[in-house]
Curated annotation (Swiss-Prot):
Gene3D superfamilies in the record: 3.30.450.60, Mu homology domain, subdomain B (2.60.40.1170)
InterPro entries the UniProt entry points to: Adaptor_comp_med_subunit, AP2_Mu_C_sf, AP_mu_sigma_su, Clathrin_mu, Clathrin_mu_CS, Longin-like_dom_sf, MHD
Residue ranges of domain MHD in the record: 184-451
Family per record: Belongs to the adaptor complexes medium subunit family.
Name under which the protein is recorded: AP-4 complex subunit mu-1
GO terms under biological process: autophagosome assembly; Golgi to lysosome transport; intracellular protein transport; protein localization; protein localization to basolateral plasma membrane; protein targeting
S-S bonds: none
């Protein structure tokens, strides 16, 4: 049983507020929660907080705070599960969960809360049941873009661009509008991996970890059967080997409760009948043993002068991806000693950009091709920088410099080597149009740290 539910923006602005029992301090409770949250040290706040006789349980999703309050002795895990389910429902009904979509669909959100919770007690979180009662249609904002015209050729003929999933396709509401009877039957399947790496100053690898998920977003009718074929060499644990190749190994794996595994052991096929909406089909983890080289290596060189306070940093970044692959939105973040007053730079490409900000150097590279090597020479004046004793120059890193961290995205690439071989649907709609299937592989950095 919960007393209140509210959604706050990242700045603490209340977007949604619902008082189920009338036994609280009103809307001031939301302001109290945000004051307690921002008053805590560090970036990681506890998901459960206490004030007087009231408990605050919250999750953060897409920059929003979803908060439930209660004065009862309730398991926090059950409330965290409820908040996670509410976040999924709001994303399914509104198309995506963000400050903009919530603001445009306030009436829809309140109608959902009225059906999910009655006097603070959970009634249902099943989309199959809720779709019979929710009458408000989602408001979807689609800004005009010239790129939308690129899919239309001469006399309306399709171009190659029309065969690519539109950027806003995966953010549509799962439930079709009553006035839109021509909504396509589509399935989006994403293999997403988060890479965490720690590299020592001598270049040796100290830690590597891959957290992977297979995410599904289905616009097909609930209960439509589908089969997902994974790489046949996929194995779990070090003792299991499959095929004649090197094998694609993970340490741990878990599946959604709706996944049937009769064909998994023999053919690495997952069979399921998912409901409409989003779900995580499979999660897996791999540590300390990647089948391929790390995507990036950094070779730093540091020179600093005792007398003038001049600091020179030369960075050489090598991309060890295959030549046909590329990394996007690459950013190198390098903390600097205090007191930097100027920066001069020499970059290896005109599309690159480097600037100072918040006590660090930010080096942005929009696109890095596999097998390429980029460099940057950065010279800074640090008047208050203490020089090394007994000598004018030093090649050791001064106090406050580093470690460097990288953020990037790797489209069509998985660090574990796991791939989706096929996605087959048993659903056959009326008419000649077959369901559209979109499969995407993506890796991105979670914590990619290189010591200087």
């Amino acid at each position: 049983m919960i007393s209140q539910f509210f959604i706050l923006s990242s700045k603490g602005d209340p977007l949604i507020y619902k008082d189920f029992r009338g036994d609280s301090g009103g809307r001031d409770v939301a302001e109290l929660f945000y004051r307690k949250l921002t008053g805590l040290p560090g970036d990681e706040s506890p998901v459960v907080m206490h004030h007087d006789d009231r408990h605050f349980i919250h999750i953060r999703h897409s920059g929003l705070y979803l908060v439930a309050t209660t004065s009862e002795n309730i398991s926090p895990f059950s409330l965290l599960e409820l908040l996670s389910r509410l976040a999924t429902l709001l994303g399914d009904y509104c198309g995506s969960l963000s400050e903009g979509t919530i603001s445009r669909n306030v009436a829809l959100v309140y109608e959902l809360l009225d059906e999910v919770l009655d006097y603070g007690y959970v009634q249902t979180t099943s989309m199959e049941m809720l779709r019979n009662f929710i009458q408000t249609e989602a408001v979807v904002s689609k800004p005009f873009s010239l790129f939308d015209l690129s899919s239309v050729g001469l006399f309306g003929a399709e171009t190659q661009q029309s065969k690519v999933a539109p950027s806003t396709a995966a953010s549509r509401p799962v439930l079709a509008s009553r006035s839109d009877q021509s909504q396509k039957n589509e399935v989006f399947l994403d293999v997403v991996e988060r890479l965490s790496v720690l590299i020592a100053s001598n270049g040796s690898l100290l830690k590597v970890d891959v957290q992977g998920e297979i995410r599904l977003k289905s616009f097909l009718p609930s209960g439509s059967e589908m089969r997902i074929g994974l790489t046949e060499e996929f194995c779990v644990g070090k003792s299991e080997l499959r095929g004649y190749g090197p094998g694609i190994r993970v340490d741990e794996v878990s599946f959604h409760s709706s996944v049937l595994l009769e064909e998994f052991e023999s053919h690495r096929i997952l069979r399921l009948q998912p409901p409409q909406g989003e779900l995580t089909v499979m999660r897996y983890q791999l540590s300390d043993d990647l089948p391929s080289p790390l995507p990036f290596r950094l070779f730093p060189s540091v020179q600093w002068d005792r007398g003038s306070g001049r600091l020179q940093v030369y960075l050489k970044l090598r991309c060890d991806l295959p030549p046909k692959s590329q990394a996007l939105n690459v950013r190198l973040h390098l903390p600097l000693p205090r007191g930097v007053v100027s920066l001069s730079q020499e970059l290896s490409g005109p599309e690159q950009k480097a600037e100072l900000g918040e006590g660090a150097l930010r080096w942005d590279l929009p696109r890095v091709q596999g097998g390429s090597q980029l460099s940057g020479l950065f010279q800074m004046d640090v008047p208050g920088l203490p020089g090394p004793p007994g000598q004018g120059h030093s090649a050791t890193a001064p106090l406050g410099l580093g470690p460097a961290s990288l953020s990037f995205e790797l489209p069509r690439h998985t660090c574990s080597g796991l791939q989706v071989r096929f996605l087959r649907l048993a659903f056959r709609p009326c008419g000649s149009t077959s369901p559209h299937k979109w499969v995407r592989h993506l890796s991105h950095s979670d914590a990619y740290v290189i010591r200087i």
